[in-house]
Amino acid sequence: MVYSIDFDQFLHTHIESGADVTLLYHAVDNAKEAYLTCNVLGLNRQKGVESIEPNHGNKKNQYVYMDTCVMKTELFISLIKEAKNLSSMYTLADILNDKCETLDIRGVAHKGFFASITDFPSYYAANMALLNYKSAQELFHDNWPIYTRTNDSCPTQYFNTADVKNSVISNGCQIEGTVENSVIGRGCVIKKGAVVRNSVVLAEVTIGEDVHIENEVVDKWAKLVHKKEIVSPAEQPGYIRRNDTL
């Protein structure tokens, strides 16, 4: 799950409500074709949770459970023990679903960017979604930095032949070709005449001269130099493995 939230506020909302458990959810209108590996909540008018069930793709408007909840430690431990006694396959969501009638379980809506990355298509879709500047602003905030491992590199070099549109490009790259609607990782080399469209290119990849790739995810250290056209259908993006040479 990829999202941004102030957990202090979430915890305060839970305490003020007096609920036993508070679940975080995101309202979506495309649940028929997306979030098919997620659980969805059944809510009453007071935002009380009546059920936690798998998304079967039979309704477009759903409340997707974000696998985030707040409860007292003692309650959490007792639920885990009860679930273990019932079945080793029982999850926390399963036992919470069983307790909807006996516990006060409530839902809190999340606002802003949200992506559930549970398979390859959702990974690709989440990367493409963040090319939208408004969506990126909902996730990344100037006054709320993201702590991550740093890697100092020189700025990306754009040559005279470079043509870049609507893309996110990390530092340390050398861009001589065309890049459109793509995410380019650190230290990539895109040679003269190369075209990269609608693709996610991870770090240290080399795209050779006159190579055309479209709708692809290219893993680290791959070299695309011999095969001149690698294009997958937009609805089924392709994957090029780490360290591959094509």
Language-model regions: role of each:
Residues 1-127, 240-242:
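Unchanged
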